[in-house]
Amino acid sequence: MKPEIRDWLQNNYFSVAQPVLKNGADIYPLILASQQGRADVVRFLLEQDAALDVVDQYGNNALWAACYADNSDCIGALIHAGVDIDHQNAVSGATALIFAASTGREKVVGQLLAAGADTTLKTHDDFTALDLAATRKILKLLSMLVKSGD
């Protein structure tokens, strides 16, 4: 284990011996590392067989957290590892794509679409990523896919 990863685990109150387990604050290291954009830690945790289906207190998975961080390396590592790209959180029903579209993260939207994110999923309030697109570029990206039927 690299010293910077050991330090990160210790500084965030995770077990060095069992690095994929939650800390005392009920936070999963994969979620926090993704949220912080720590691709090195995310890759390490994935190598340690971190569960891909863990969620935070709001029901968001690690992919959502990586999208929040706007970190394409974390997003790519999680998608490559097989994270559920279309996971819908329990609170709003939003997916990572819906979140990214609604917050103007254009690069993230492009990356998720290239990986096959479902554009037809809806929030509990019946909104799709297209409905919530925050920028013209995102609107164009999503509307081209919806019109083509992909």
Report each predicted region and the residues it spans:
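Start-of-repeat signature of ankyrin repeats
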Residues: 26, 59, 92-93, 126
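Ankyrin repeat boundary/linker residues
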Residues: 22-23, 56, 89-90, 123
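Ankyrin-repeat inter-repeat connecting loop/turn
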Residues: 16-19, 52, 85, 119
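Ankyrin-repeat-protein effector appendages
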Residues: 1-11, 115, 124-127, 131-150
